[in-house]
Curated annotation (Swiss-Prot):
Family, as annotated: Belongs to the FtsK/SpoIIIE/SftA family.
TM segment ranges: 35-55, 85-105, 117-137, 145-165, 172-192
Membrane topology summary: Multi-pass membrane protein
Organism of this sequence: Vibrio parahaemolyticus serotype O3:K6 (strain RIMD 2210633)
Gene Ontology terms for molecular function: ATP binding; DNA binding
Subunit structure comment from the entry: Homohexamer. Forms a ring that surrounds DNA.
Function, in words: Essential cell division protein that coordinates cell division and chromosome segregation. The N-terminus is involved in assembly of the cell-division machinery. The C-terminus functions as a DNA motor that moves dsDNA in an ATP-dependent manner towards the dif recombination site, which is located within the replication terminus region. Translocation stops specifically at Xer-dif sites, where FtsK interacts with the Xer recombinase, allowing activation of chromosome unlinking by recombination. FtsK orienting polar sequences (KOPS) guide the direction of DNA translocation.
Cytoplasmic side: 193-1028
Protein name: DNA translocase FtsK
PROSITE patterns documented for this protein: FTSK (PS50901)
A GO term from the CC aspect: plasma membrane
SUPFAM superfamilies for the chain: P-loop containing nucleoside triphosphate hydrolases (SSF52540), Winged helix' DNA-binding domain (SSF46785)
Length: 1028
């Protein structure tokens, strides 16, 4: 406070002085020139030293005809060589010391500054000692720099003189103490002050750590006036200070005591995941809660504002203390205090008069309250009865059926008679309801007439009586006498009846249209605003609040000891060597004793789960890169991994591929992503409710966050019509979402034809994959030589010239329920999928197959051989886990997105906690893409004809094969017998098996029988002939 005031006064004095001359005198000019020369010299020295080359000619090196690498030229090479030879590696700080010395000497313009020769002499002596001892220490402890000694010739001479006598340790100690003495001589800083400063910093750090662990705020030390304040003054505090002290947490005895030393217990290494967000340990101050005010007192109470400068009793305070406080107050605060004092004087008068008025008002309310309480209950009941009778009569008299769209006209002249019955002496203040104070629950609600007009009009309008509201009971002292009411209804003319009928028809039609356009139904066309961003943003996804992962070390160590004891019960000696807590599970790494097989622990997984009271325990037999066995236990409270957490991770942001997919987080909380282009196909399997469909949606959403329709396209097959139909209308789709399994075969066959077409184009351009194809098209377009379609022929299109080749996007085929597709369409789908899985990688066509029935008749060996990447959610048995992953473990998963990921080219599974995307997240991303454009469907994908390029090996076109002579007879037999098996046709017509099979295939091509199902039977599709 004193320093701020002193600066303020000094500033005022400076502004009152005459302006100084802008010209420099002679001595000032000389000092400024010396400063410029010093800075220039330091820059030249730095350039020469940092660009030194041993090959340059110098004082210690001779060279002829070579180029000089030093940026300072020949002079710089000689200068740097001389400094390195003299001081060694300590030549690098010389330019900085020279610039600092120039600044210190020339920073003041004063001419009449006395020169203290003693001070400058000690500084020069200290600088000399510092340089010599530093060179000596560098020569002893550091390696040589190029062909110079690390301490230069100065350090070499000192070490050669001291080493024979003092040895290395003694020489180092002597030079260190001399260095400390030189530092004090040069800077004038006492080492005692340095030690005190270090001690203060250390204590402050320890106090901060203690407060952080204790969870309390840091103490605020208030300055005390030890010289002036007496003991009796210290007991008096300002009210604000007392309130501040009350808000601070008080440290009790058990919070301050040090914990007692526990017995020596084995500590387990716990590897904590990296915290996502750090929160302050200081708890926020609780906000003041609003006080409840009684309902009787409806007038606000005037609260006098508290002044900023509190008046303290100065009876027992020394006058010096008061003067010290006045010195600490600034001029602005004194002016504000004076202005506020004037305001207080006027406000006191206003508050006094307001208080008097409020007191009179409270007396009136109390008197009126007592008057109401004195009324008996029978009087209240009689008032209710009279009012109910009056309301019933009014309802009977006013009950008239109006014609459509015509409001009844009520004669309001009779209403004036009602108001005359109200006595003017019964006037009550409308602002306060005395009856509500007596009993707020027994409120009478008057019945409302049903045939009134839409706009409510008051039936009774008393001038001196408080208006009766539905929520408020009438005053008991008011009695109404019913009067006959006359209602006049206007006659409806004949011409208006047609208009009313037409309007009713229009309104009914509009009501029907509004019923069909329910806002909760999926609309085909939506007017959505076009986003400005090229890709969807993170604001579309749900962002959970900041979660803190509280990990109890003692609980984890207790579980580790329990694991060791339970394994010991089964005669297995193992030690827990590492604990890795994660968001869903915690992995305990076990070091088995010599001779213990891993198979013994694997067979005890269910027993360990029972002994540890866990849902499931998974044993990781091999941890890559470690000689330990993993034991994965579920956490007591699992965390939800949201899609926004993984998409905002650096792993996903740094990925450049448009086919990047999100899987979730591993056991350490790190994001796990993959690239479908490198998989190149993925098989997803799991039971119902294990998170399989959510995982597929997360994969699709992650690709929508990375790729535009020019880079990626989808073909979606959804037999359940629920999971993938939500993506209908996004511009990434090549065709509508396939829900009919008969159309799914055409879609897969179109993919085979597209794959063959792409292979022909890539072979013509001499590239090996889609990425190289697109890059070559880009290079050709930039060079001004666009590439035309080499396989175009006249008649293929209406163009007269071959069209230009366009960029080929990646195509991802998503099948949500592969088992239903196999069941309906049959084995032909398996052949198409196998062919795509074998060859479609280079063509940029990738498959995502999901099934909830991981059996061998669905996931066949042909499919598993061509789809190396698998994702297994929770399954029922170990057999299903082996069907998917060729190993067990999926039966021990926890469900709700818990999965095992088998990456391509690896036999070790990775446990991943799948990311969660809600329906709102999916709708938000889908609507964002729908607003950007409409899809461009290709009709041939679903309803296209079978082309020759899409046929499987051995297939023939339908037109290339002639009908069998027995075809008509076989059709008649199959339609009548309703059996279309090959063996039945063979026995009935006594032909060979191959001929019968060929005829049945012709029947299938003509749509008479269906394709063979999973059991080999065919269904007769043609209707039966009519019976005579």
């Amino acid at each position: 406070m004193f320093k701020e005031n002193a600066k303020k006064v000094e500033t005022i004095i400076k502004t009152s002085e005459e302006p100084q001359s802008s010209r420099l005198n002679g001595f000032q000019r000389l000092k400024e020139c010396c400063f410029i020369v010093g800075v220039l010299s330091s820059v030249l020295l730095a350039v020469a030293l940092f660009t030194f080359s041993p090959a340059d000619p110098s004082w210690s090196q001779t060279a002829w005809g070579g180029e000089i690498d030093n940026a300072g030229g020949l002079f710089g090479a000689w200068l740097a060589d001389t400094l390195f030879f003299t001081f060694g590696s300590l030549a690098y700080p010389i330019p900085f010391l020279l610039a600092a010395a120039a600044w210190v000497i020339c920073r003041k313009r004063g001419e009449d500054e006395p020169i203290d020769f003693m001070l400058w002499g000690t500084r020069l002596l200290g600088l000399t000692v510092l340089i010599m001892t530093s060179c000596g220490l560098a020569d002893i402890n550091f390696d040589d720099i190029w062909y110079f000694s690390s301490g230069g010739v100065v350090g070499d001479v000192l070490s050669s003189l001291a080493l024979p006598t003092l040895n290395v340790l003694g020489t180092t100690l002597v030079l260190l103490f001399l260095w400390g003495a030189g530092f004090t001589l040069f800077t004038g800083i006492s080492w005692l002050n340095i030690v005190e400063w270090l001690g203060d910093r250390s204590l402050a750090v320890l106090a901060a750590i203690a407060n952080k662990f204790r969870g309390s705020e840091q103490e605020t030390l208030e300055p005390q006036l030890d010289e002036f304040v007496e003991d009796k003054v210290s007991t008096k505090h300002v009210e604000d200070d007392q309130q501040d002290d009350e808000t601070l947490p008080h440290l009790t005895a058990y919070e301050v005591e040090e914990p007692k030393e526990k017995a020596a217990v084995h500590e387990y290494p716990i590897y904590m995941p990296q915290a996502k967000s750090e929160t302050s340990a200081v708890k926020p101050t609780p906000e003041p809660q609003p006080q409840r005010v009684a309902a009787v007192n409806a007038t606000p109470t005037y609260v006098e504002p508290e002044p900023q400068l509190k008046a303290v009793s100065t009876d027992n305070v020394d006058p010096m203390v008061e003067r010290t406080k006045q010195l600490n107050v600034t001029i602005e605060e004194l002016e504000a205090a004076a202005q506020q004092a004037d305001d207080w004087a006027s406000e006191e008068q206003t508050s006094q008069s307001y208080a008097d008025t409020n007191a009179v008002y409270q007396e009136q309310v109390q008197a009126k309250h007592e008057e109401v309480v004195e009324h008996d209950t029978p009087q209240l009941e009689s008032s209710y009865a009279e009012y109910a009778q009056f309301a019933a009569q009014q309802e009977q008299q006013l009950h008239v059926e109006p014609t459509p769209h015509e409001e009844p006209v009520i004669d309001t002249r009779a209403l004036d008679d009602i108001t005359d019955h109200a006595e003017p002496s019964e006037h009550i203040e409308p602002t306060i309801s005395d009856f509500d104070v007596v009993d707020e629950e027994e409120t009478y609600v008057a019945p409302q007439p049903q045939s009134r007009s839409p706009e409510p009009q008051p039936m009774v309008q008393p001038q001196s009586v408080s208006q009766i509201q539905p929520e408020q009971a009438p005053e008991p002292s008011v009695a109404f006498e019913p009067a006959p009411q006359e209602v006049e209804v206007e006659e409806v003319q004949d011409g208006d009846q047609d208009v009313a009928a037409f309007q009713s028809m229009v309104s009914s039609a509009q009501a029907k249209v509004a019923a069909t356009q329910n806002p909760f139904l999926m609309k085909q066309e939506q007017n959505l605003p076009v986003p400005e961003e090229p890709l969807p943003t993170l604001e579309l996804l749900y962002h959970p609040e900041k979660r803190e992962n509280f990990i109890d070390r003692e609980a984890l160590e207790q579980v580790a000891r329990l694991v060791e004891s339970k394994l010991a019960d089964y005669k297995i000696k193992a030690d827990v060597v590492g604990i890795y807590p994660g968001p869903v599970i915690t992995r305990f790494e076990l070091d088995l004793a010599p001779g213990v097989k891993v198979s013994r622990i694997s067979g005890l997984s269910m027993d360990l789960a029972r002994a540890l009271s866990a849902m499931a325990v998974r044993v990781v037999e091999v941890i890559p890169g470690k000689p330990y066995v993993g034991l994965e236990l579920p956490n007591m409270s699992r965390q939800t991994v949201y899609l926004s957490d993984v998409i905002s991770s650096p792993q996903f942001e740094q990925a450049k591929s448009p086919t990047t997919v999100v899987l979730g987080q591993d056991i350490a909380g790190e994001a796990v992503i993959a690239d479908i282009a490198k998989m190149p196909h993925v098989l997803v399997a799991g039971t119902t409710g294990s998170g399989k469909s959510v995982g597929v949606n997360v994969m699709i959403l992650s690709m929508l966050y990375k790729a535009s329709p020019e880079d990626l396209r989808f073909i979606m097959i959804d037999p359940k019509m629920l999971e993938l139909s939500i993506y209908e209308g996004i511009p990434h789709l090549l065709a509508e979402v396939v829900t009919d399994m008969k159309d799914a075969s055409n879609a897969l066959r179109w993919c085979v034809g597209e794959m063959e077409r792409r292979y022909k184009l890539m072979s013509a351009l001499g590239v090996r994959n889609v990425k190289g194809f697109n890059e070559k098209l880009k290079m050709a377009a930039e060079a001004g030589h666009p590439i035309h379609d080499p396989f175009w022929q006249e008649g293929d299109s209406m163009d007269t010239e071959p069209p230009l080749l366009e960029k080929l996007p990646y195509i991802v085929v998503v099948v949500d329920e592969f088992a239903d597709l196999m069941m309906v369409v049959g084995k032909k789908v398996e052949e198409l999928i196998a062919r795509l899985a074998q060859k479609a990688r280079a063509a940029g066509i990738h498959l995502i197959l999901a099934t909830q029935r991981p059996s061998v008749d669905v996931i066949t060996g042909l499919i598993k051989a061509n789809i190396p990447t698998r994702v297994a959610f929770t399954v029922s048995t170990k057999t299903d886990s082996r069907t998917i992953l060729d190993q067990g473990g999926a039966e021990s998963l926890l469900g709700m997105g818990d999965m095992l990921y088998l990456p391509p080219g690896s036999s070790h599974t990775i446990r991943v906690h799948g990311a969660f995307a809600s329906d709102d997240d999916v709708h938000a991303v889908v609507n964002n893409w729908k607003a950007r454009g409409k899809p461009n469907y290709i009709d041939e994908i679903i309803s296209g004809d079978q082309g020759p390029e899409s046929l499987l090996p051995g297939e023939q076109m339908e037109s290339d094969e002639e009908m069998d002579p027995l075809f008509d007879q076989v059709v008649e037999h199959v339609v009548q017998s309703r059996r279309g098996s090959v063996s039945g046709v063979q026995r009935r017509f006594k032909i060979g098996y191959n001929r019968a099979a060929r005829i049945v295939e012709q029947l299938e091509a003509q749509g008479i029988v269906s394709a063979p199902g999973h059991n080999g039977n065919r269904e007769v599709l043609a209707p039966a002939p009519p019976k005579d």
